[in-house]
UniProtKB/Swiss-Prot annotation:
InterPro entries for this protein: Ribosome_modulation_factor (IPR007040), RMF_sf (IPR023200)
Protein name according to UniProt: Ribosome modulation factor
Chief location category: cytoplasm
Gene: rmf
Keywords: Cytoplasm, RNA-binding, rRNA-binding, Stress response, Translation regulation
Organism annotation: Escherichia coli (strain K12)
Free-text disruption phenotype from the record: Non-essential gene, 100S ribosome dimers are not formed, decreased cell viability during stationary phase. A quadruple raiA-hpf-rmf-sra knockout strain is significantly outcompeted by wild-type after 4 days growth. Very high sensitivity to aminoglycoside antiobiotic gentamicin in stationary phase cultures.
């Protein structure tokens, strides 16, 4: 059960990262639950930081 939960949160983080790299707005987050949303936003923020470094 814990592994499945962690995988779901990891997937949310990865999708947030991909959205950030693509330049999408953080308001585009598809998740409603707090944990998944925070993971998605964490990935999005990480991608935005990486975009600044790469530019």
């Amino acid at each position: 059960m814990k592994r499945q939960k962690r995988d779901r949160l990891e997937r949310a983080h990865q999708r947030g990262y991909q959205a950030g790299i693509a330049g999408r707005s953080k308001e585009m987050c598809p998740y409603q639950t707090l944990n998944q949303r925070s993971q998605w936003l964490g990935g999005w923020r990480e991608a935005m930081a990486d975009r600044v470094v790469m530019a």
